[in-house]
């Protein structure tokens, strides 16, 4: 077995106190700097004094270079240093040989070709340099630096034809845009405008970019060829078509025309661009168009620009949120103002295609008005009745009538058919609407239509159908009775009112009873009206009913000699007395106060001071008292101050309570013995008052 290897023990530090002298980082750096080795002196310069020493020196250097190349032939810097050293020694042939060996070793190294050609040009070896550039561009035609150097050399040698020939060879490879621009600039330096134009003709098809077409057009303009520049812009618009065109081209085209004072042409270009470009790519175009119109346009032109800009904004809004119906309404109003029928219809079709995402009426309210406006436009502006009818039918088929409907739409459709003299279609549509979704508005609209047509039998049938669906609707009963009254059939109207008031459930019974009473009063049936008031009071004791009853009695006429004021006052006063007594029994203090105030005003108008004083004696006084606040859970939450009314009649009706309090006090005094001190009796005297106070408070709260 191998013995376990023993690890050296960690030396224990006996003294862990900090050293007295602390070493800083600055001190460490200073000591390291002081201990640096001294800089070696440069080697001595060697002076060569005769050809033998020179030959020996050259042999040693060449041997060093060759050794380096044998060690690593792939290091380009060794070749370059070797060739440049030979060039310094004026050994051009040797240097050329080294460059050739380097190219044989790595012929695709751009630096080698450039250095080699630079050496030939520096030593004025033009043919060698030309041959070298030919070889370079043949091997690597995509290296633009070779072509730039080659053409520059030929141009410096004033060999313009040779430089042009090199450019042509270069252009056959369809280089980048800068190369074409360099060729154009070369021709322009020698005033060869036609040649430059030919280069541009080829350039814009090799690199079909908008900016290159704009450069071509500006080239023509800068040399005075205005028609040529315009023709270039027109060709560019045709070349790109509607799919690939950009707003930059139209802006440049319009500014060109603006510079030539052709403002109408510029305006047409802007409008054409706005019509054919997608709306999300015309922001700068709008700005340029607006500036142009502000500088050169009239009021109509400026308004046209503003309208176009607003159309673009609305297009963005509806594209971002297709269910933004408010934006659709604004957009459609703008389109309708222009009057382009096809565009209006197309926009309406786009708008109505955005159906609300959920079958909830709140989402559909604004959407339905798109259909309504569409139908009204087709009827009133386009005057296309068949298309209008189809719009209404399509919309009605789209609405989920089992969940909700729109009565307004049914009625508009029926009214449209009436205007088209299609009465049967209108009735059929409304009948279908009532059968599918009986709504109050539908019934009333249908009834109003039949009343206008003087079809009263149909009105009766519709009212009967209406009341079958909603017998609790008081307005329907009132309208039905009003119709019969207008037709002179009072018995039928009275029977309708009787049926109405006998319904077990009504939404607004007070209006129905009032209408019934007004109906009888208008017929002069005073006794029947009084009976109706009595019947109504059997059902409710509301203070307003009593007040209305009193006013009714006050306004009656008795006999043929005119109104009997005294009799009316007595009848009305009797009603007030009955009402006061009834409300007192019910304990309705608030209503009782209202009644007494109305009674007081009545007596003031009657100018009867005696009766007026009686009423004033009945007026209550208002007091403030505290009562407990009890929550819905029955928990007491504190006290609050409330106002209450104390009526004199109620206080007079409390003798029994006062008698009970006095009897209790007498009993207390009797229970006290004769031996008790008087102070005890005196102390017990307030007890009945304390007992009576709660009784009074309780009574006042009843």
Swiss-Prot record:
<feature type="compositionally biased region" description="Low complexity">
    <location>
        <begin position="683"/>
        <end position="702"/>
    </location>
</feature>
<dbReference type="GO" id="GO:0000974">
    <property type="term" value="C:Prp19 complex"/>
</dbReference>
<comment type="function">
    <text>May be involved in pre-mRNA splicing process. Involved in embryonic neurogenesis and cell rearrangement during Malpighian tubule morphogenesis.</text>
</comment>
<feature type="repeat" description="HAT 3">
    <location>
        <begin position="124"/>
        <end position="156"/>
    </location>
</feature>
<dbReference type="InterPro" id="IPR055430">
    <property type="entry name" value="HAT_Syf1_CNRKL1_C"/>
</dbReference>
<dbReference type="GO" id="GO:0000398">
    <property type="term" value="P:mRNA splicing, via spliceosome"/>
</dbReference>
<feature type="repeat" description="HAT 12">
    <location>
        <begin position="488"/>
        <end position="522"/>
    </location>
</feature>
<comment type="subunit">
    <text>Colocalizes with a complex containing snRNP proteins.</text>
</comment>
<keyword id="KW-0217">Developmental protein</keyword>
<dbReference type="GO" id="GO:0071014">
    <property type="term" value="C:post-mRNA release spliceosomal complex"/>
</dbReference>
<dbReference type="InterPro" id="IPR003107">
    <property type="entry name" value="HAT"/>
</dbReference>
<dbReference type="GO" id="GO:0005829">
    <property type="term" value="C:cytosol"/>
</dbReference>
<feature type="repeat" description="HAT 4">
    <location>
        <begin position="158"/>
        <end position="189"/>
    </location>
</feature>
<dbReference type="GO" id="GO:0008347">
    <property type="term" value="P:glial cell migration"/>
</dbReference>
<dbReference type="Pfam" id="PF23231">
    <property type="entry name" value="HAT_Syf1_CNRKL1_C"/>
</dbReference>
<dbReference type="GO" id="GO:0008366">
    <property type="term" value="P:axon ensheathment"/>
</dbReference>
<dbReference type="InterPro" id="IPR045075">
    <property type="entry name" value="Syf1-like"/>
</dbReference>
<keyword id="KW-0539">Nucleus</keyword>
<dbReference type="GO" id="GO:0005634">
    <property type="term" value="C:nucleus"/>
</dbReference>
<keyword id="KW-0507">mRNA processing</keyword>
<comment type="similarity">
    <text>Belongs to the crooked-neck family.</text>
</comment>
<feature type="repeat" description="HAT 5">
    <location>
        <begin position="191"/>
        <end position="222"/>
    </location>
</feature>
<dbReference type="Pfam" id="PF02184">
    <property type="entry name" value="HAT"/>
</dbReference>
<dbReference type="InterPro" id="IPR011990">
    <property type="entry name" value="TPR-like_helical_dom_sf"/>
</dbReference>
<feature type="repeat" description="HAT 13">
    <location>
        <begin position="524"/>
        <end position="555"/>
    </location>
</feature>
<dbReference type="GO" id="GO:0071007">
    <property type="term" value="C:U2-type catalytic step 2 spliceosome"/>
</dbReference>
<dbReference type="Pfam" id="PF23241">
    <property type="entry name" value="HAT_PRP39_C"/>
</dbReference>
<keyword id="KW-0221">Differentiation</keyword>
<feature type="repeat" description="HAT 1">
    <location>
        <begin position="56"/>
        <end position="88"/>
    </location>
</feature>
<dbReference type="GO" id="GO:0071011">
    <property type="term" value="C:precatalytic spliceosome"/>
</dbReference>
<dbReference type="GO" id="GO:0003723">
    <property type="term" value="F:RNA binding"/>
</dbReference>
<feature type="repeat" description="HAT 9">
    <location>
        <begin position="339"/>
        <end position="373"/>
    </location>
</feature>
<dbReference type="GO" id="GO:0000245">
    <property type="term" value="P:spliceosomal complex assembly"/>
</dbReference>
<feature type="repeat" description="HAT 6">
    <location>
        <begin position="224"/>
        <end position="259"/>
    </location>
</feature>
<feature type="repeat" description="HAT 8">
    <location>
        <begin position="305"/>
        <end position="337"/>
    </location>
</feature>
<dbReference type="GO" id="GO:0071013">
    <property type="term" value="C:catalytic step 2 spliceosome"/>
</dbReference>
<feature type="region of interest" description="Disordered">
    <location>
        <begin position="670"/>
        <end position="702"/>
    </location>
</feature>
<dbReference type="GO" id="GO:0016607">
    <property type="term" value="C:nuclear speck"/>
</dbReference>
<dbReference type="GO" id="GO:0007443">
    <property type="term" value="P:Malpighian tubule morphogenesis"/>
</dbReference>
<feature type="repeat" description="HAT 2">
    <location>
        <begin position="90"/>
        <end position="122"/>
    </location>
</feature>
<feature type="repeat" description="HAT 11">
    <location>
        <begin position="454"/>
        <end position="486"/>
    </location>
</feature>
<feature type="repeat" description="HAT 7">
    <location>
        <begin position="261"/>
        <end position="295"/>
    </location>
</feature>
């Amino acid at each position: 077995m191998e013995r376990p290897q023993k690890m050296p023990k960690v030396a224990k530090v006996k003294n862990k106190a900090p050293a007295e002298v602390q070493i800083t980082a600055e001190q460490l750096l200073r000591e390291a700097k002081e201990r640096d080795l001294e800089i070696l002196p440069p080697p001595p310069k060697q002076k060569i004094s005769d050809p033998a020493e020179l030959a020996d020196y050259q042999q040693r250097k060449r041997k060093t270079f060759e050794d380096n190349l044998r060690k690593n032939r792939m290091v380009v810097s060794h070749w370059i240093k070797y060739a440049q050293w030979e060039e310094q020694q004026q050994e051009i042939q040797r240097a050329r040989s080294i460059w050739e060996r380097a190219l044989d070793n790595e012929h695709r190294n751009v630096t080698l070709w450039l250095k080699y050609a630079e050496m030939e040009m520096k030593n004025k070896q033009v043919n060698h340099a030309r041959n070298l550039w030919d070889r370079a561009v043949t091997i690597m035609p995509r290296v633009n630096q070779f072509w730039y150097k080659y053409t520059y050399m030929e141009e410096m040698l004033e060999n313009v034809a040779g430089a042009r020939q090199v450019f042509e060879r270069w252009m056959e490879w369809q280089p980048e845009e800068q190369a074409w621009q360099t060729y154009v600039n070369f021709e322009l330096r020698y005033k060869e405008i036609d040649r430059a134009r030919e280069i541009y003709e080829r350039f814009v098809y090799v690199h079909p970019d908008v900016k290159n077409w704009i450069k071509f057009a500006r080239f023509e303009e800068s040399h005075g060829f205005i028609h040529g520049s315009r023709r270039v812009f027109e060709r560019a618009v045709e070349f790109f078509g509607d799919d690939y065109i950009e707003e930059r081209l139209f802006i440049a085209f319009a500014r060109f025309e603006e510079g030539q004072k052709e403002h109408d042409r510029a305006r047409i270009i802007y409008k054409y661009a706005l019509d054919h470009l997608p709306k999300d790519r015309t922001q700068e175009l709008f700005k340029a168009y607006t500036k142009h119109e502000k500088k050169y346009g009239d009021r109509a032109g400026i308004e046209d620009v503003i309208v176009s800009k607003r159309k673009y904004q609305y297009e963005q809004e509806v594209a971002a949120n297709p269910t933004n119906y408010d934006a659709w309404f604004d957009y459609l109003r703008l389109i309708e103002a222009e009057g382009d029928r096809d565009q209006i219809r197309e926009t309406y079709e786009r708008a109505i295609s955005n159906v609300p995402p959920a079958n909830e009426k709140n989402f559909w309210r604004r959407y339905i008005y798109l259909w309504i406006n569409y139908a009204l436009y087709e009827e009133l502006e386009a005057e296309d009745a068949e298309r209008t009818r189809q719009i209404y039918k399509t919309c009605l088929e789209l609405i989920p009538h089992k969940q909700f409907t729109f009565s307004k739409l049914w009625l508009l459709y029926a009214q449209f058919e009436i205007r088209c003299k299609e009465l049967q279609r209108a009735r059929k549509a409304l009948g279908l609407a009532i059968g599918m979704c009986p709504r109050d508005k539908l019934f009333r609209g249908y009834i109003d239509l039949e009343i206008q047509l003087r079809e009263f039998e149909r009105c009766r049938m519709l009212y009967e159908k209406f009341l079958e669906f909603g017998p609790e609707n008081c307005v329907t009963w009132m309208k039905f009775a009003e119709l019969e009254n207008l037709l002179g059939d009072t018995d039928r109207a009275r029977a309708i009112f009787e049926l109405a008031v006998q319904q077990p459930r009504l939404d607004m019974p007070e209006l129905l009873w009032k209408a019934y009473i007004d109906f009888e009063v208008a017929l002069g049936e005073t006794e029947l009206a009084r009976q109706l008031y009595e019947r109504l009071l059997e059902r409710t004791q509301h203070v307003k009913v009593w007040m209305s009853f009193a006013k009714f009695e006050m306004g009656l006429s008795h006999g043929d000699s005119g109104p009997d004021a005294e009799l009316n006052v007595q009848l009305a006063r009797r009603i007030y007395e009955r009402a006061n007594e009834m409300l007192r029994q019910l304990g309705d203090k608030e209503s009782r106060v209202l009644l007494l105030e109305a009674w007081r005003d009545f007596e003031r108008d009657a100018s009867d001071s005696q009766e007026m004083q009686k009423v004033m004696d009945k007026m209550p006084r208002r007091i403030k008292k505290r009562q407990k606040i009890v929550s819905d859970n029955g928990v007491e939450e504190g006290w609050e101050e409330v106002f209450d009314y104390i009526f004199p009649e109620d206080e007079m009706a409390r003798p029994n309570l006062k008698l009970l309090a006095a009897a209790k006090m007498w009993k207390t005094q009797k229970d006290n013995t004769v031996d008790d001190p008087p102070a005890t009796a005196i102390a017990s005297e307030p007890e009945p008052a304390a007992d009576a106070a709660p009784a009074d408070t309780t009574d006042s709260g009843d």
